[in-house]
Structure formats: structure tokens, C-alpha cells
Amino acid sequence: MGGLALLARAKGHRVTGSDANVYPPMSTQLEEQGIELIQGFDPSQLGEAGCYPDLVVIGNAMSRGNLCVEAVLNLGIPYTSGPQFLADHILPERWVLAVSGTHGKTSTSSMLAWILEDCGYQPGFLIGGVPQNFGVSARLGESAFFVVEADEYDSAFFDKRSKFVHYHPRTLVINNLEFDHADIFADLAAIQKQFHHLIRTVPGQGKVIWPADSHAVKQTIEMGCWSEQETFHIAEVTKGWHAKALSDDCHEFEVFFDGESQGVLEWALIGQHNIENALMAIAAARHVGVKPSAAIAALTRFVPPKRRLELLGTVHGVSVYDDFAHHPTAIATTIKGIRAKVGQSKITIVLEPRSNTMKSGVHKDTLAHSMLQADEAFLYQADTIDWNMKEAMEAAVIPVTVLHQIDDVVAKVSASAKAGDTIVVMSNGGFGGLHKKLLAALEVSPQFVQQAD
């Protein structure tokens, strides 16, 4: 929604917005762009009769009973959903490159937008995070090309279709597919049905790029695909895309297409998952005319989005990272990448299970295993979590501490830290400001202060 606000303003509209709790980086971005942000949902923000907004864009987190929503309906103010606004006002006559999938959407769409930018295509984009190569999550662009992070979550309380069915991409990337969003989907099959609807919107002359090793994606493709296809493979192949890691942490790898080397990429990112994200972005860029060698060169200058294994700081030799991982697969993948980078050094995970799916307990039986390659973990159990986290963590093979107060988490984590440790904070929310609190606590933690004396 913050990105949509930027696009609407760029189209010449006066834009205001409201929310209950906006946190960085989006709150910072809106402030820097001069967009007024109103805290809360007092209907008075809609103005007086005769001065109502021309249009209200309602986010999918809003439901009936919200004071502003009820006022919009009662007053007859025109309204729409975010995806429909994008489809009606931004995407017409654009070559849409949509990046979808359970994991890696923000990273892959950021890579793709940067490749196009670096190669002179001047694309528009709308991305869930803030790509640091651009500093904003959205812009109109100066060409026909528009990159969009295509989410399967529903559009609004009045439109329960997945957001991405509104986008009509000509280039579609499906990164991967797992069960998620248990609050709106009954099972994986329900999610696959929505992806099938998305595939139906891609024109015959368009292209669908997908991972051949994903059984769930393959099943979805087999439901019907009328467009050209390109596939990514983990193993070496003579048809499609694959990569060969040249370093243990995957920060260097060679790219192959149809069995031919396209070049070697050495960059700041780590992990097999980022190799896969890069291949998808390179393949999508090739569809609009970018040579793979040029895309590889562009990615050497790529800076990952904020909150995607972002180094927040190093205090007394302790490195603190921020990561958006909120699904057991993403948690395990991130830890695997960090382990390859730091070797035998201690890795501490600080996790807030905040997504609706996590809070429901759907992933409680796989959460402990997802942290297997870490050395210890501290979990924050908020009041909104109604399953016994401590009981679920009995299956863990590493020490796991469950705490109910954020300040207690900060105190325990900072007290256990030693020089050379890596701490990874994982949450898809603001985590009650824990990140800054932890960095501050490490600065004055007794074990480091005593050493300094």
C-alpha cells in the first residue's frame, strides 16, 4: 500500500493514508517522500461533505467493522482495492513482469528491476520491500516495462481473489510453491488453484518461468499452460537454466543456459536460494531482450532489499542481521546460507512468529527443525499466539528459550553474546523495536564493557 501511494502521487494525485502501526522501512519511506500518514482510523480523516476523497484504496488487512471502512460505505465514497487500482491506473499498456511464489518474491523482483535499470530499460516497479539500489519500493518508470511483486494473498474484503490475477503479466516468474497463508487457504491445492488462474492470464506469446524441481509448481503447470515456458534446474541440464556454485556460501557461481555458460557472477549475497532467485531474474530479463551476460554484470552491483539478511551493525565483534523470514523453509534456507558464510562460529536466532500462518500454529511441528543449523534460538511468544511454543520446541536439538517480553529477549540475547557471534533477527513485522534495542544492549553488555576495561 505504501508503494501504491508513491505511484498515485507520481500520477499527480494528492495522497494521504492511514494505518494502525506502520514501521520501518515503509514508515521511513513515506516520510521521506512527503506523504502524510495518519495514525488510526478516525473517519474524520475523510473530510467533510463535498470534500471527500475522489477514491479510497482499501488494503486487504481492512475488514467490515473498521470505522473508516464503514464510513466509506455509508457515505458512498468511491473505493477500490490496491491490486485493482494498479490494474486500472498503472498497468494498462505496460509489459508486466510479475514475480510470484511462496519465497523470494521481494529479492527476485528487486534483482529483476535492477537488471532492467542497469541495462538502460528504466522500468517501473512495485515491490513489497525497499530495493536499496533504488531507495523506494515503487516508481512509475520511463518505459513500457513494469516489474511487480505478485502476491497470492487476497485483494480486499470485497474481492477474495488473489492479488496477482489483476496484473495480467506478459512475463511470469513462479519461484516456488508451498503451503502458506493458512488464514485464507485451506490447503496447498487451494493455493495451486489461484496460481492456475494467474497462469491463465498470461498471453500465448508471453512466458512462464518456473523451477522444474518443484513438484507443486509442476502440478500447477500441468493444470494448463498456454504460454511459452522456461525452466530452472538444480542439476546440470542441456535445456533450460542451471548454475554451478563456485564457493561454499554460494556468493560466486556460474550461470548456464541450454548447456552453455553465460558467465560467472560474484556478488555480496549468499545462499543457494539467492542463486535460484538470480537465475529467475536473469531469465525474465532475457525475455525482454537483456543478454544474460549483461544481466550478470548488473547483478554484481546489486544491493539486496532491506530486511533480507540485512546487516544492521557489528557491535564488539557481534554481527546483527535483520531478515524477513517467517516460514520454516525460509528460516532454514537463511540459516543454511549464514552457516556456509561463518563456518563454525556461533549463530543465534531471534524469532518472532508473527505471520497469521505462524500465529495459527500451522507450522509449529516443523519450526524446531528449521533452526537445526543454528547454535541457539530465542523465540518471542506474543499474546496473540494461542499455541504452546515451549512445548513445540521440545523437539529442537539446539537450546531454545521462549520468552514473553521483548525486553527479556533483548536481555537474554545480549547477555549470551560473544565476539565473533552472528545474531539473526527474524520477523515480518517491527518486532517491537527489538533490533535497535538489541544493538544498544550489546554496546553496554557487561562482558564487553569488562573486556574493554
Model-derived features: positions:
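ATP-dependent carboxylate-amine ligase
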Residues: M1-P25, E31-L37, Y52-V56, I77, ...
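Gly/Ser/Thr-rich loops at beta-strand to alpha-helix junctions
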Residues: M1, S63, K105, H215, ...
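Short, polar loop motifs at secondary-structure junctions
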Residues: A20-Y23, F41-P43, N60-S63, Q84, ...
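Acidic-glycine-rich active-site phosphate/pyrophosphate-binding loop
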Residues: A245-S261
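Phosphate-binding loop of NTP-binding sites
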Residues: L7-A10, E31, Q45-E48, N60-W210, ...
